[in-house]
């Protein structure tokens, strides 16, 4: 199960002041999920701009473990200012993933910064039975497979294309949300079918 951290931990002027909220959430019993616990998403307000010192301090607040259980953190910055090499470098240093978003309103940052990948696809179409056109699902299946095998798709926007990720197998988490939401389960199943057949 993937979790979305509460907004009060990240919707603040100074991210680095969220330590108590981060700790309260991490100690709220999430470790009870055991090996079923997936990534923890920290979603920033769309108005939150990149401040390297503050962002770096926030990343340091994210604990590596809870009650002995390894935690995997992913941040979703939704302001264009985060689409820069410095933000990517800070996440890579912390081992924190950045959401690879496919959205109309938010920047795409497809740089691999952790040992897993987390994508949020937000361009679904309720008029299509599978939520996404077949060609788009084919493309995302190909990207997911490439990520899982340790590669980096070259058709997505990266903030720091000069840096290549360490080539290693990765878990890949892909979510269909927002637009065409009623069709999201169908999109997920259609994507899984393509991956199973690959």
Tell me what each language-model feature is:
Residues 2-198:
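Residues lining hydrophobic/aromatic ligand-binding pockets adjacent to catalytic sites
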